[in-house]
């Protein structure tokens, strides 16, 4: 899957002799889900290395700062990255990242935090990999309904209604 994403980003197919330098910046590497995702990503890149595609990856932690993430993208591009994977700190503020990448013709794969549609239309080398937020919300709602039906203890005041439900997401 990783090689397909990288191929999709380029104007040409990646050949076995190409070197792929991937720059990754995450909003917060202390996030458990992101940590696991990065482990899997690195395993996939190691698999590509074993199969003749030379890959290098540099991972940066923005630690919740959009300014830091913007600077990291510049550093990664200046270091020679030919593809960026960005987990945005602020999904509504990717313009500086997009502008720098576009200026240097480095495609961006946004992951897990989807930029707004208007930003995704800024350039034809922007991609998003992740869940459909609306679908995730619907699934959370369906799971909550099923749990309530299966466990009457959830209705604490026994009036047949749930007064308060918290669903978390972006």
Task: State where each predicted segment sits.
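Sec-dependent bacterial lipoprotein signal peptides
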Residues: 1-7
């Amino acid at each position: 899957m990783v090689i397909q994403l990288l191929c999709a980003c380029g104007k040409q197919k990646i050949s076995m002799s190409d070197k792929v330098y991937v720059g990754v910046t995450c909003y917060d590497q202390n996030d458990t889900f992101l940590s696991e995702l990065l482990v899997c990503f690195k395993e996939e890149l190691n698999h590509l290395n074993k199969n003749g595609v030379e890959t290098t990856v540099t991972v940066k932690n923005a630690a919740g700062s959009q300014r830091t993430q913007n600077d990291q993208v510049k550093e990664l591009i200046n270091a020679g990255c030919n593809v960026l994977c960005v987990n945005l700190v602020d999904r509504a503020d990717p313009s500086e990242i997009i502008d720098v990448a576009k200026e240097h013709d480095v495609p961006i794969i946004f992951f897990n935090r989807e930029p707004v549609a208007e930003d995704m239309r800024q350039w034809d080398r922007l991609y998003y990999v992740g869940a459909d937020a609306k679908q995730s919300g619907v699934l959370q709602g369906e799971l909550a309904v099923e749990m309530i039906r299966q466990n009457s203890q959830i209705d604490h005041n026994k009036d047949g209604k749930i007064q308060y439900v918290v669903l978390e997401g972006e």
